């Protein structure tokens, strides 16, 4: 059994030249809702998302003045980022429990009949594990277990599937730590707070001026 390669963003079809990512970040793209390695930067007040495996033509941009109508939109963007999901180590399959969130490599057919499949990554929930004795090849332990999962994203959302360790990545629990992303999201959130305070102040009745109070007192 040859040793597998599970590099994030790998495709069966020819891939564009890789771009240098910010380590440890992945992003759920708006175009296909799949997860990709990425890095971010704030340029001229806009958030730029740059994919690890695509050219800059595929970059996604977020404009604070056009893409956010409420604080909920900020939360939705925040949920599109997380720490990198690492491939499941063959020796650690026993750590998985039903209900765990996984990120799985899926072969997505190309647009044409003869196009090769592209590997894209979508989330799924682990339902059951069928344990099996592990093999050892050239001194390396290789998991032979089977994992029953149900996809929560992508073209197979809601579908159940049985997969092997080769396609399984583990979704981290800890939040992402990226200064550029955090600063951008916090700035947009603060703008909503300022707008709310301005609207509240505008809705309050104007306080009486001292001269009007004196006129009212003299009339009494």
What are these regions (language model features)?
Residues 1-220:
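Eukaryotic chromatin- and chromosome-associated nuclear factors
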């Amino acid at each position: 059994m040859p040793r597998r390669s599970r590099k994030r963003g790998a495709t069966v079809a020819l891939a564009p030249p890789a771009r240098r990512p910010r380590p440890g970040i992945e992003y759920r793209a708006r175009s296909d809702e799949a997860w990709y390695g990425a890095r971010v930067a704030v340029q001229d007040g806009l958030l730029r998302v740059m994919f690890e495996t695509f050219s800059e033509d595929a970059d996604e941009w977020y404009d604070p003045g056009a893409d956010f109508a409420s604080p909920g939109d900020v939360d939705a963007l925040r949920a599109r980022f997380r720490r990198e999901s690492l491939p499941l180590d063959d020796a650690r399959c026993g750590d998985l429990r039903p209900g765990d969130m996984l990120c799985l490599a899926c072969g997505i057919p190309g647009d044409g009949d003869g196009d090769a499949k592209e590997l894209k990554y979508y989330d799924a929930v682990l339902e059951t594990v069928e344990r099996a004795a592990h093999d050892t090849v050239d001194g390396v332990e290789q998991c032979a277990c089977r994992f029953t999962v149900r996809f929560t994203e992508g073209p197979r959302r809601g579908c159940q599937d049985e997969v092997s360790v080769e396609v399984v990545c583990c979704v981290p629990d800890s939040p992402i730590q990226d200064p550029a992303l955090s600063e951008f999201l916090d700035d947009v959130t603060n703008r909503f707070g300022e707008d709310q305070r301005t609207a509240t102040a505008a809705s309050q009745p104007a306080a009486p001026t001292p001269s009007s109070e004196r006129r009212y007192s003299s009339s009494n």
